[in-house]
Amino acid sequence: MMRIAIVGAGSIGGYLAARLALSGQRVTVIARGANLSAIRANGITLRLPDGTEERAIPELATDDLAAAGPHDVVILGVKGQQIPALAPTLGPLLGPETAVVPAQNGIPWWYFQRCDGPYAGHRLESIDPGGVISSHIAPERVIGCVTYQAAELEAPGVVRFIEGNRFTLGEPDGVKTDRVRALARALTRAGLKVPVRSDIRTEIWVKLLGNMTFNPISALTRATLGEVIGYAPTRELVAATMAEAQEVASRLGITFAITTERRIQGAAQMGSHKTSTLQDIEAGRPTEVEWLVGAVAEVGRLVEVPTPRIDALYACLTLLERTSCSGRTDHGSPGTKSMVDQIYEKERDHA
């Protein structure tokens, strides 16, 4: 039985850890603060949509990565903007064959790794500033994933599961390896639906179309998904912004099996749901703006596709984050400037 470490026991990390532990698998939870104290004392309480609760006890809950030691799989359950600071600390969890599964929204730092084409090996500065992530997590360790769970961390050690049990996996090079199949079996035993794709990047873009439009628009307007879609001008903005992103993706060889309208209709079923970005802004937390929006704008420049709507949403959301996150001096990855600041600095340098 493989040992799986979940780094970050927030809503998604906590949900995955609970499901794996409840299915009898060896799970280590890497957490900190009040959340760690609660998990050590009472395990993870999983609140289900029918009102029932389950309590999961992981094999180990700790903030000491050296004490946890090497694992077969490390799932990164933190937000994307936390990974640049986290990556240099992961060494104690990584053995020679350890796989790393980043469970973040947006374009992942490894997107142009282990692939062919004119952009193979390209690094996205917006999400991997200075190469800090890729220099500490070797490309061959990565298994790509796309998560579809909606959950909330209601209190330390308490996760409310809302919906969604799909957790798509795929090697960046498209090979269905023994390790990705083994992880899929483990997650399937935990009650998740786990397709293994030979082209994980297409599924990344399908989900991203929603995240990079609905999330910033909802945060800027303080509106739910239903309100964004129900108001004709913002619905039109969503569709036009999705079209920009689709053009960017098409330059990378991505094709979409569903139309923009179907994608919008699917989101409409979420009704009064608040996007995670809106929740972050309301709580004064940093958002995933670089991963959801900034990276798309950066890829647009790389493939020479104009993205005026994406650029506008990005500029507005980065400013909103800057003014909403109390005591925060930056609004991108730790220790870095946002892509907006970098672009304007370059323009000033050449003025």
Roles of regions detected by a PLM:
Residues M1-P49:
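NAD(P)+-binding Rossmann beta1-loop-alpha1 motif at the extreme N-terminus of oxidoreductases
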Residues M2, D72, N165:
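Nucleotide donor/acceptor-binding cores
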Residues V29, L60-A61, L169:
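Generic preference for hydrophobic
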Residues E54-E154:
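Rossmann-like NAD(P)(H) cofactor-binding subdomain of soluble oxidoreductases
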Residues L93, S134-K207, A219-A257:
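Internal alpha-helical scaffold of NAD(P)-dependent oxidoreductase catalytic cores
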Residues E227, R235-A351:
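NAD(P)-dependent Rossmann-like dehydrogenase/reductase catalytic/cofactor-binding core
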